[in-house]
Amino acid sequence: PKTEAAAKAAPVYEQEYAKVVDSVYEFISDGTSDNLPEQGRTGICEVRNFASREAALQQLGYTLQDISGDGVPELLIGWISQKRGVGHYGKEIYAIYTFADDRVKYVAEGWSRSSLQLMANDNLVTRGGTGISHQVLAVEHLQPDGSLGCYELYFTWPKDDGLCVYRNMNCRSEADAAQETDMTVEEFNEMRSEYANNSVEIEYLPLKDFKKQGFKGLMRQYLSAGG
């Protein structure tokens, strides 16, 4: 019987991810933030500030999806924008956590001024900025060790009497560490919009169902075809 119980037990990463989701549930439900991770809470706090408890529990979602390609899924928490049939879907991601070195590690977060979305090739795209003169588009990929590898970063920066678009392969949004492009601001904004349009929908489970459902009900999309 013990062997059977062990076989049916959830993987360690799933047990640890459940603690994170439970902390988010507690925070949305009654404001308890004692167990809420320090990193990855910005967007979640925004939701609690502008939405009612009931709406937040319905619109915040969670799922497991392997976006690093190492066979172990990441935990994604995001915003459910629509329901189709029995599924709940959304593009916006508020927090991503991975499981590496036998523990949960923070990866990235999104919020109202810094949109975080997933592409079909599992790249992560961040579109944000600190104002009209400094807008950013970052394309990154999660490595198996839990770190983010930077593919490219574009950003605007004041130059002379206007704005210039820069490109940096190290994801540092500083003009002196980047290469000036001949891209116009309009072209840059079009590129940002194109990434947003091409980002993928994520199927989430509503946070309101976590206590009774946990991770059951996921299509186990994070498992390989042979798993």
Kindly label every feature range from the protein language model.
Residues 67-80, 121-127:
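Acidic/hydrophobic-patterned starts of short beta strands in beta-sheet-rich repeat architectures
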